[in-house]
From Swiss-Prot:
Pfam families: Ribosomal_S3_C
Entry GO terms, CC: chloroplast; cytosolic small ribosomal subunit
Listed Gene3D superfamilies: 3.30.300.20, Ribosomal protein S3, C-terminal domain
Example of a GO MF term: structural constituent of ribosome
Cysteine pairings via disulfide bonds: none
rRNA-binding keyword on record: yes
Assembly behavior: Part of the 30S ribosomal subunit.
UniProt keyword terms in alphabetical order: Chloroplast, Plastid, Ribonucleoprotein, Ribosomal protein, RNA-binding, rRNA-binding
Domain of life: Eukaryota
Record's protein name: Small ribosomal subunit protein uS3c
Family to which this protein belongs: Belongs to the universal ribosomal protein uS3 family.
Species name: Drimys granadensis
Subcellular location: Plastid, Chloroplast
Length: 216
């Protein structure tokens, strides 16, 4: 039963917070959600085009909206991927995102916050595993290496799951590995989670990661 519900939504208000902070009337609520999605997509596309490494390194993106301002905070594990050798990197990103959606009366402000322990973030870890799978590294080797990286971030437990046509086998299957404790049913346990999709030469693989950060 522990895998039937999203661990982030299950803990909202306890030890997880919303990543979009704004208020809208019911008629314009869907428009606000679409706007958030466009902003996140624009940022990820820009980082993919301008990065030197094979991964984005973005942990998550927070969006705060006011009447005349949209504040975007990018939590990134490796800021150099975005701004290395580019003095106007953030300004270029802001202009690029501004073009992606129509916002005449609101200013767009983008800030970058560095994540202290990048490999303690499930999104960054999933990108690492995806990159290994694209390079035809064995899925078991990729999962074990990911767990080794997580141990450096002082986490209490991790579970990694890969589903699909693993290693090009004709029948799709699910493989998973767990290290330490991952108490999914304990609400006071802070658990970070992500679902990530990667396209390989054999087809689409789904990666899910649960990281037990701490107990409050």
């Amino acid at each position: 039963m522990g895998k039937k519900i999203n661990p982030l939504g299950f803990r909202l208000g306890a030890n997880q917070s919303h990543r979009s902070l704004w208020f809208a009337q019911p008629k314009s609520y869907s428009r606000g959600l679409q706007e958030d999605e466009k902003i996140r997509d624009c940022i990820k596309n820009y980082v993919q085009k301008n990065m030197r490494s094979g991964s984005e390194g973005i942990s998550h993106i927070e969006i705060k909206k006011k009447i005349d301002l949209i504040q975007v905070i990018i939590y990134i594990g490796f800021p150099n991927l975005l701004i290395e050798g580019r003095t106007r990197g953030i300004e270029e990103l802001r202009i690029n995102v501004q073009k992606g959606f129509r916002s005449v009366n609101r200013r767009l402000n983008i800030a970058i916050t560095r994540v202290a322990k990048p490999y303690g973030q499930p999104n960054i870890l999933a990108e690492y595993i995806a990159l290994q799978l694209k390079n035809r590294v064995s899925f078991r080797k990729a999962m074990k290496k990911a767990i080794e990286l997580t141990e450096q971030a002082d986490t209490k437990g991790i579970q990694v799951q890969i589903a699909g046509r693993i290693d090009g086998k004709e029948i799709a299957r699910v493989e998973w590995i767990r290290e330490g404790r991952v108490p999914l049913q304990t609400i006071r346990a802070k658990i970070d989670h992500c679902s990530y999709t990667v396209r390989t030469i054999y087809g689409v693989l789904g990666i899910k990661i649960w990281i037990f950060v701490d107990e409050q």
